[in-house]
Amino acid sequence: MSGKASGTKAVDPSDVIVIVLGGGRGSRLYPLTRDRAKPAVAFGGKYRLVDITLTNCLRSDLKNIFILTQFNSFSLNRHIWQTYSRFAPRDSYIDVIAAEQTRESGDWFQGTADAVRQSLRHALRDNPRCVLVLSADQIYSMDYRDLLRWHGEHGADVTIAARATPANAISPLGVVKVDETLRVVGFYEKPRSPDLVADYRVDQLPAAGVPADKPFLCSMGLYLFNTDVLADALDNDEEDFGKSVIPQTAQRRHMSCFPFDGSWEDVGTIEAFYKVNMDWRRGSGVAEAFQRGASIITHARQLPPSRIEGTLVEDCLIADGCHIHAQRLTRSIIGVRARIDDETIIEDSILMGNDAEETLGCFEIGRECVIRKAIIDKGASIGDGTVIDVPESTPDADHELYSTRSGIVVIPRVAVVPPGTRICGDP
């Protein structure tokens, strides 16, 4: 890499290092993150969350990528090796970096900024012009070359991607304040009320191009830094990009806002994860961009077509290698190699199926089960006659065999649910 000085030309993808933030313990996605890093969580019947981000990168000719993780990185490492080794040319790489002790730091990653700080030395070896910081728990389709072009044409030190957002949806996000050139002049992380950021509204700003019902620009957690600017911004003890690094850098550097008008979803919670999967099943929201031809790269399994016998199937996605004899499947996603026995009814659920490499358990739903609004993780076994059907008002809780989140039952990986079990929210 040449380490070219910043100017007004578009940034060449070969002069960019990508750092993908894999998250910490993933407590908000527990128990799906009990045995794996967040980027390795299964999604959409046959993918992993990290596949979305890496597909965006590879389609954008970005092929030098580090994925940062802190916990349970084995399955992620295996997936990356199985899937992406063939996409990296000899002089490129897609590597997983786990938190490590060094002479400079003996601690775990303390936040998003600290994770990049501790890992930046790996990226600096190639002297890139820019570093692109992404998150592994977001679902969207983007050609990052548009972002690189914007960054160069605006002569920015930092470019932050943002999207138009309704006032009632900004509280969990970072709100961006821009001037008429879309230069960032303020940043407010997670405002409790729209009144606190009333002067951040951009619906009267022609350059922002936002609809009247989405008057705020909110950060997507996607940052493109000139490398020297990133190193300077992290030369401190700040732990988080949104809370400290971005607001401080906006005051001292030229930070530009890249408006993104596509669909985007954060899947940091079980409720959000469930919703995005159901949108994916319907082909709505973020799924639309991928169904228009932006295929997703994932592990190429050599599986036969699924066999479905005597089952009424309505509005479902069914992956390869399944054996299904159920009575009815409705509004559900059935993952690879799932087995579902006779007279079983499944509604509004996500069944993750089974990996060929699993040595603990084999995903199977027994006879005469009724399963509604559940997420059943890989390798789980559900005994005959099991009923899973809790009220929407069921409190969030963790039990020996399952967890409940926002009225959704989650059965952990390789769990064994005995025959006749009733998970119905009964007192």
Predicted regions and their residues:
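Proline-centered turn/helix-capping motifs that create local helix->coil transitions or kinks
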Residues: T83-S92, E180-Y188, S193-V197, R282-A289, ...
